[in-house]
Amino acid sequence: PIEDVVVQTEFSPTLWCVPATIDVAAVEIDLINAADRESRLRLALREYLQGLEEKGQPKIDYVLIDCPPSLGIMTINAFVAAGEGLIPMQAEYYALEGLALLTRSINRIAEIHNPGLDVSMIALTMFDKRTTLAREVESEVRTYFPRATLDTKIPRSVRVAEAPSFGSPVVFWDPRCTGAVAYKQLAREIALRGAPSQAVTEEA
């Protein structure tokens, strides 16, 4: 159960986390022949959120599911559980090809398991406005996903890359660096957009 592993973070009293461990690597194998293997995460989240409501605890506004860079059973579980998809994308050529593949996969998962799923937001990351490639990639993404592509772009930043080695999000470790400022602006933009898709607790 999620309630057995969820922890309150040191960064905010309203920010909770379900941390991953090395044991996650075995999940792909464990779920190969499991019943409802694509829906395990959705069921676990529904149980946890309903439990909070029954106990009269504060409602969780957002559930963010961080996915591995693959289309394995873990990622499929995340898409089946999600109400909408936010895709962070590096402003590079191969990332553009990967975006096309990912969106097709998401559409397929939506058809079979989660009709309410959609790519509602795309965030450009590691963006270097000095390069022609980055600007061309941005133009392509905005052409094909004009409504989903967010205005805020995350620039390349050494401080962002360094922050994990200090065990802290960059917005706490160096809140004034360009990367931290951009991430805070991105969070505001996402919050203002709201969550128009179905809630994770609804039936797909």
Regions inferred by a protein language model and the residue ranges of each:
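P-loop NTP-binding core
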Residues: P1-A204
